[in-house]
Amino acid sequence: DNKELSISNDGRGTRYNAHKPTFGDFSGWPFTDVTSPLNPFSQRDTYLKIAARKPTGTRGSTGLLAPVDMDGKGLWVKAPCYFECRFLAHSAPGTWPAFWVLNQTKNLPGDELDIIEAYGGRGEGNPNDSGYYATAHYWQQKDSEGKEVKAPWKHINMLEIGSKTSWSTTFHTYGLRVGKGSTVYYLDNIEVFRHATNRYSGEQPLFFLVNYAIGGASGWKINLERYDNSSDMYVDFIRVYQGK
């Protein structure tokens, strides 16, 4: 029952945050505002282009978008709800594209659901060029014995599903439905992972983030010199549906 869009069909007039709401950023090349001389955002045909660049003498720049500001004000939806994003990104050592949802604010317990978290490059230290991870994180949550609550995750091998192509070779649509009972992850409308909906995901509102991180908290080394320290991600659309 996902018939009502939570935001406008074309997104015109919508304002976005270029940093991780209520928390610090995590990219080795900093997430950068649209007002910066190193603005990473532009429109190419009908696509949003996120350009990661590191001109000589700079720390570099890249992009993140979220519909919630640093005070937590913005677009939130509650279960049952559905999120999807269609994008293409460059696979190279250090690239770290992701589409994910979050409901944790400040230092309170909450959930992070990574619909796609991909790491570029091949070989040791670059683990999933041909696939990606769908991962839940249950932050600051303890069970009845005081132990950290274990969160489910799965590596998705894209070369065995659907069109059998990687996130770096063609556009794919990555979706997530958070229901009252189950949380389901999709690749091009094909279910690829499912787990029970955690308490915080089922009871508290969520917002999405899309980003093109370069190195940073991932721990993967950056090696983009062969590409003149430049790399791009193209986003076709992001859709958010609020169920009834």
Model-assigned labels for residue ranges:
Residues 1-244:
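GH16 jelly-roll
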